[in-house]
């Protein structure tokens, strides 16, 4: 699988130049440029996992190196600092992002040609969480969401996957297609979490299919997982 690692260069120095009354401004600018990056990424059929904001990842199977270069140039035009990128390859998203991350510390960031793989996206949703908000505090609900995020992250890490919190009670994960059965086995009898699985040629399609799967689960309350796959 192919993962693009993106690092904002001299990001800390940029934030420090904003003065002491800066946290609100940092959040404003971060959200503004991430909104633009999401828009650009969607045009190239990928999706940014924003993670730390100053470092983020993209699953880029199904995208040519030429398209990646155009996308990176488009992103650079909308960021307040320079960026460094590196393309990593691995049997799993976890391995690919590790190789891409190591590459970020090297002087050269040339893109090698790698084989594209199908992408498996996972859209997790917590059952009854919205209803539970009536009986707990906003902060306690957030703590529960955070604990589940940690548990899901650890599980996916063990099978070579990566995870991003989407907001609310939703999470987005990526695994290799070889690990999908492990996900199904884990959540087939789980009455707390449902997972929509999508398999596609690129990240955007895989995520769309994962969300489609999740909606089908919601319409059939007896199921805890469903899978949709793109065929060519």
Swiss-Prot record:
Disulfide bonds: none annotated. Keywords: GTP-binding, Hydrolase, Nucleotide-binding. GO terms for molecular function: GTP binding; GTP cyclohydrolase IIa activity. Transmembrane segments: none annotated. It comes from the Archaea. GO terms for biological process: biosynthetic process. Its EC number is 3.5.4.29. It is an enzyme of class 3 (hydrolase). It catalyses: GTP + 3 H2O = 2-amino-5-formylamino-6-(5-phospho-D-ribosylamino)pyrimidin-4(3H)-one + 2 phosphate + 2 H(+). It holds the Pfam family GCH_III. Catalyzes the formation of 2-amino-5-formylamino-6-ribofuranosylamino-4(3H)-pyrimidinone ribonucleotide monophosphate and inorganic phosphate from GTP. Also has an independent pyrophosphate phosphohydrolase activity. Belongs to the archaeal-type GTP cyclohydrolase family. This is GTP cyclohydrolase III. The lineage of its organism: Archaea, Thermoproteota, Thermoprotei, Sulfolobales, Sulfolobaceae. The gene is gch3.
